[in-house]
Amino acid sequence: MAALAPPVAAIRRAVRRALTTLPDAGPVLVACSGGADSLALAAATAFVAPRLGRPAGLVTVDHGLQEGSARRATAVVDWAHTAGLAPVEAIRVDVSERPGGPEAAAREARYQALTEAAGRLGAAALLTGHTRDDQAETVLLALARGAGPRGLAGMPTRRWLGEALLLRPLLEVSREQTRAACTALGLAPWTDPHNTDPAYARARVRSEVLPALVRALGPGVLDNLARTARLVAADTAALDEQATVALDGVRHPDGGLCVGGLAGLAPAVRGRVLHVWARELGARPGALSHRHVDALEALVTGWRGQGAAYLPGGLRVFRRAGRLTVVDPCPPA
């Protein structure tokens, strides 16, 4: 018997670790584009899940952005059936009328489709093939836009996606390993042309910035960027817990926040309290930026009698009688 290729073994171990942490015995789904990362993940899941007594299926999303995308989706479905995965679905989405750039629109449509599929199929978890290299790219993009700790924490290994857990088992596996695993298993992954299209910021980071960093600083830079994300994520989680407790301590019975209590908090905790409160008020996470939180902060620590701080959705926050008070958007005339 031929020895198991080390990349294949590494990916199977990563999948086993992820699946053994699931409390629910329900099925898992792999989100698979047909690229090397998700294909290697799907192959590992098809091997590991049955040995843990867990059903495993696959979902592929066709964004319709490239010629032949429907054929690619059909090829993924056909392979999944031969690999023993079930249920298997291909979902076509329309990204043409969604707001934002094409990357953001495709991502939003994809995750909406995956969330609906996981709910419809009763999945306990949805697995995606994001790798260490994806994590390094995410950290660099966050640095470039001046993100805070939450952005520098990168992609979490798990989070809720509707009623299912979204798992990223391969965040400590390199892209080189997923490609090598596909080669060892005789799989022919699809290459997404968008991954090398310089019109996209992530593609430029992937093809230009990361290779330059590796040449200048050595190959360990990718591991170190991913490690930074893990360390920052741990610190962020601890601060978030403190902020949850602190928020309860500064709430006013009318739903506002007591300025005196806010002023006594450490700045890192206070910023999180204001961010969480703004989300509770209805500000969408994707629209809520550091500028909105800074405006709330100014009502606490930079008070000069100024007017309202404005939040996404038309919400207005005033400082009145020693507390922050929200006013709903004005109704249309």
Swiss-Prot record:
What's its EC? 6.3.4.19
Q: Does the keyword tRNA processing apply?
A: yes
**The organism sits in which domain of life?**
Bacteria
One GO cellular-component annotation of the UniProt record comes to:
cytoplasm
Q: Which UniProt keywords apply?
A: ATP-binding, Cytoplasm, Ligase, Nucleotide-binding, tRNA processing
The record's section on Gene3D superfamilies has: 1.20.59.20, HUPs (3.40.50.620)
Gene Ontology biological process? tRNA modification
Q: Which residues does ATP bind? A: S33, G34, G35, A36, D37, S38
- UniProt subcellular location: Cytoplasm
Q: For this protein, what is any one GO molecular function term?
A: ATP binding
SUPFAM superfamilies registered for this protein in UniProt: Adenine nucleotide alpha hydrolases-like, MesJ substrate recognition domain-like
Q: Which CDD domains match?
A: TilS_N (cd01992)
The main location is cytoplasm
Asked if Cell division is a keyword of the record, the answer is no
Q: Show the catalytic activity.
A: cytidine(34) in tRNA(Ile2) + L-lysine + ATP = lysidine(34) in tRNA(Ile2) + AMP + diphosphate + H(+)
Query: Would you identify the family this protein belongs to, as annotated?
Result: Belongs to the tRNA(Ile)-lysidine synthase family.
Instruction: Write out the domain note.
Output: The N-terminal region contains the highly conserved SGGXDS motif, predicted to be a P-loop motif involved in ATP binding.
- Name assigned to this protein: tRNA(Ile)-lysidine synthase
Q: Which organism is it from?
A: Salinispora arenicola (strain CNS-205)
